């Protein structure tokens, strides 16, 4: 992709409004250092020096979309608690529309606490309640979806198996979005495989793709287009989900784009250094759907999302990528 084409696509990012539907959560990082072992048990003592919070899950997809320049609305469920207030405030500070964040007093806001010491993540604590939505909350979610749908150019479904998306609710939302001819994308969860149908794009990672295809995981080979098991998985998911585009992310091997009736297309990674892969999948789907909504063809959109992923894995924590960083990444890799 030449520089002019990239700039044309990026210039259209700010004209898009994207609706993100899924499980929102708050990421908490406790940063510190280890200087001794506890006398109570053979474990390190971490002296906490600072604390930071970031939107996580579907909220991180919204954060990524805002960093790329688009308008964003997020539809999700919070608890009536401090983490929920913190998450809402963080999103509002970043310009994300939070009118679709529905409070359910019978569940806590999902909170993931990571302890990072001496530059290494040591442990993660999850505080959450993974149950289906009560009927009245599900009705509110669908009402908001129908209200917002007419104003957006694309819809992203983000399932983290926390309970927002039931198969019934997803089916209704998919049908409405497809009828309205919106760009649609989904990031599946291997612990609770929902049935997607006819979306513009689906973006599993390698292990998620194998799980969805019902095949035992097989370690990758270096030549992606000679990875017969991966190619079989891709074709299986094209038949199962019937997406127009299936983008399987492959970590250090990049990505592989599958489309009905076309040969698989491998996109090598452009990451220079990898410090933290948390949230990279959120960046991929955010960039992919935004590029497609902005008029990029599937290969162009996949290449742009590959560069965005290369940027964020070089940062610590759930990070984002800006249009300027995308331009710089493409420039580096043209040399």
Each model region followed by its residue ranges:
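Positively charged, low-complexity intrinsically disordered leader regions
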Residues: 1-35, 330
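Substrate-binding N-lobe of the ribokinase-like
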Residues: 2-7, 39, 43-111, 329
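A short, aliphatic-rich alpha-helical micro-motif
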Residues: 13, 149-150, 193-197
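Structural motif
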Residues: 19-21, 124, 153-156, 185, ...
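Conserved phosphate-binding/catalytic loop of the ribokinase/pfkB sugar-kinase fold
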Residues: 101-107, 114-149
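Short acidic, glycine-rich surface-loop motifs adjacent to enzyme active sites
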Residues: 148-164
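Conserved phosphate/ATP/ADP-binding segment of small-molecule kinases
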Residues: 163-264
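Conserved post-catalytic alpha-helical subdomain immediately downstream of the catalytic base
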Residues: 236, 240, 244-245, 270-333
